[in-house]
Amino acid sequence: MTSSESEIQARLLAQALPFMQKYENKTIVVKYGGHAMGDSTLGKAFAEDIALLKQSGINPIVVHGGGPQIGAMLSKMGIESKFEGGLRVTDAKTVEIVEMVLAGSINKEIVALINQTGEWAIGLCGKDGNMVFAEKAKKTVIDPDSNIERVLDLGFVGEVVEVDRTLLDLLAKSEMIPVIAPVAPGRDGATYNINADTFAGAIAGALHATRLLFLTDVPGVLDKNKELIKELTVSEARALIKDGTISGGMIPKVETCIDAIKAGVQGVVILNGKTPHSVLLEIFTEGAGTLIVP
């Protein structure tokens, strides 16, 4: 490394210091998903980011998805994926595979990546320590032909109804980094598959996290000129949904951000997980995505 490169690195570290102080002993929940999960280089960079957060005195918690991997496993096992209103129908056989893929293979891959940095990650799902309880999701759609609201039966797709933070509080006092799969039990004894975004929002809300980061395949919320909006209040975000600036798949993402803020999260960020070290760029600089605040 040349002296000029060393000087640049030193300046970057000095610039990061105020942000390290700002977030010291604070909880940051990161929802890991999208393209980054299928790219080994991005996966390694993500693990390094999480490790550095922990080494900087921050309490990081990872929640991950795995829709494409679930679809691939179902296909491999000859089980056809069924969708209602764009949502996967999870029958009894499918939920077993969902749990196997999410809480098994994907979860342990992420744990292994973080552990390779020298940090200690622990793989969990909502069942562990009675951390999360869910109930059957209640979803409706408007029938385009009759314009009548129709109730969807999505099987074992759930919604979070309760989060017990006891286990996560214990882990926060330890050297462990929780990596959580969005699978949880119901009071009825069933196992439920939960949308990873809403699961992460529920976890972050229960912990009153300082930040919730959503790693996506887009830079953040864009204005009508396709320029990144750096910060929005909840009321501004709602206005952009109403006027059509926020549209399509970004609407449920932003609504999940709003729900998380209502639950107690101080700020939620939508950022591009395809950018290497995007988590560090968001936390230790002036920001890399769209920050939504109360």
Curated annotation (Swiss-Prot):
<keyword id="KW-0028">Amino-acid biosynthesis</keyword>
<feature type="binding site">
    <location>
        <begin position="66"/>
        <end position="67"/>
    </location>
    <ligand>
        <name>substrate</name>
    </ligand>
</feature>
<feature type="binding site">
    <location>
        <position position="193"/>
    </location>
    <ligand>
        <name>substrate</name>
    </ligand>
</feature>
<feature type="site" description="Transition state stabilizer">
    <location>
        <position position="253"/>
    </location>
</feature>
<dbReference type="GO" id="GO:0006526">
    <property type="term" value="P:L-arginine biosynthetic process"/>
</dbReference>
<dbReference type="InterPro" id="IPR001048">
    <property type="entry name" value="Asp/Glu/Uridylate_kinase"/>
</dbReference>
<comment type="function">
    <text>Catalyzes the ATP-dependent phosphorylation of N-acetyl-L-glutamate.</text>
</comment>
<keyword id="KW-0547">Nucleotide-binding</keyword>
<protein>
    <recommendedName>
        <fullName>Acetylglutamate kinase</fullName>
        <ecNumber>2.7.2.8</ecNumber>
    </recommendedName>
</protein>
<comment type="pathway">
    <text>Amino-acid biosynthesis; L-arginine biosynthesis; N(2)-acetyl-L-ornithine from L-glutamate: step 2/4.</text>
</comment>
<dbReference type="GO" id="GO:0005737">
    <property type="term" value="C:cytoplasm"/>
</dbReference>
<keyword id="KW-0963">Cytoplasm</keyword>
<dbReference type="InterPro" id="IPR001057">
    <property type="entry name" value="Glu/AcGlu_kinase"/>
</dbReference>
<keyword id="KW-0067">ATP-binding</keyword>
<keyword id="KW-0055">Arginine biosynthesis</keyword>
<dbReference type="GO" id="GO:0042450">
    <property type="term" value="P:arginine biosynthetic process via ornithine"/>
</dbReference>
<dbReference type="InterPro" id="IPR036393">
    <property type="entry name" value="AceGlu_kinase-like_sf"/>
</dbReference>
<dbReference type="GO" id="GO:0005524">
    <property type="term" value="F:ATP binding"/>
</dbReference>
<feature type="site" description="Transition state stabilizer">
    <location>
        <position position="31"/>
    </location>
</feature>
<dbReference type="InterPro" id="IPR037528">
    <property type="entry name" value="ArgB"/>
</dbReference>
<keyword id="KW-0418">Kinase</keyword>
<keyword id="KW-0808">Transferase</keyword>
<comment type="similarity">
    <text>Belongs to the acetylglutamate kinase family. ArgB subfamily.</text>
</comment>
<dbReference type="GO" id="GO:0003991">
    <property type="term" value="F:acetylglutamate kinase activity"/>
</dbReference>
<dbReference type="Pfam" id="PF00696">
    <property type="entry name" value="AA_kinase"/>
</dbReference>
<feature type="binding site">
    <location>
        <position position="88"/>
    </location>
    <ligand>
        <name>substrate</name>
    </ligand>
</feature>
<dbReference type="InterPro" id="IPR041727">
    <property type="entry name" value="NAGK-C"/>
</dbReference>
<dbReference type="InterPro" id="IPR004662">
    <property type="entry name" value="AcgluKinase_fam"/>
</dbReference>
